[in-house]
């Protein structure tokens, strides 16, 4: 099992969501990830390549999407035209046993969404009961993956907003839960 990246789609001229057979690396990192996948699969065809998205948890030592939103003291800026998944690390760990049973190949791996990062962030700020402004940011490339291939094999994640909500609940950070 190898972790790859959603970046293998970073050069795609299409809007997405992207399936595993439509790679288009747009930078050196992405090209190297795709090359790694191909080299490993050439030697061990039964290997599983997980094209992972941004991941988050609140106990992470480095900043991540959710921590950045929670710590924001000024306006947050996200593109209304950028679609991509962000995935709760706990769900990654919960899915690893099922991942070990996957047939060899590449799999898009993580939470799906039909909302832009701008829309997700607006909803998350509202859910947190915060007044932090969310402003439209510059366009960014979509890294919007179709994770259906893995889901058909039983590797299933909550959608992005449900995963964020679950993480906040796990850490008792939902305002309505703290008030009760």
Model region roles, listed by residue range:
Residues 1-6, 50-52:
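SDR active-site strand-loop-helix element
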Residues 8-50:
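Catalytic helix-loop patch of NAD(P)-dependent Rossmann-fold dehydrogenases
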Residues 10-14, 59-60, 88, 118-120:
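Short glycine-/acidic-enriched loop or helix-start segments at secondary-structure transitions
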Residues 38-85, 91:
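NAD(P)-dependent short-chain dehydrogenase/reductase
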Residues 84-87, 115, 145, 155-158:
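Residue-level signal for the nucleotide or nucleotide-sugar donor/cofactor binding architecture
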Residues 90-98, 165:
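Amphipathic alpha-helical segments that line or abut small-molecule/effector binding pockets
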Residues 95-147, 175-179:
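Mid/C-terminal beta-alpha module of Rossmann-like enzyme folds, strongest
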Residues 160-180:
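Amphipathic terminal alpha-helices
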């Amino acid at each position: 099992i190898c972790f790859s990246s959603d970046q293998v789609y970073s050069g795609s001229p299409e809007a997405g969501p992207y399936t595993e057979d439509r790679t288009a690396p747009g930078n050196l990192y992405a090209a190297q990830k795709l090359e790694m996948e191909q080299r490993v699969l050439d030697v061990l065809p039964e290997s599983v390549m997980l094209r992972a998205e941004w991941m988050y948890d609140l106990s992470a030592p480095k900043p991540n999407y959710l921590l950045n939103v929670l710590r924001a003291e000024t306006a947050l800026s996200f593109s209304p035209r950028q679609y991509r998944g962000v995935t709760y690390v706990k769900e990654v760990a919960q899915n690893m046993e099922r991942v070990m049973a996957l047939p060899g190949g590449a799999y898009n791996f993580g939470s799906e969404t039909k909302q832009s990062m701008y829309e997700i962030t607006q909803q998350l700020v509202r859910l947190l009961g915060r007044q932090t402004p969310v402003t439209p940011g510059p366009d960014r490339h979509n890294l919007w993956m179709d994770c259906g291939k893995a889901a058909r094999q039983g590797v299933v994640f909550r959608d992005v907003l449900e995963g964020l909500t679950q993480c906040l609940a796990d850490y008792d950070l939902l305002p309505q839960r703290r008030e009760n």
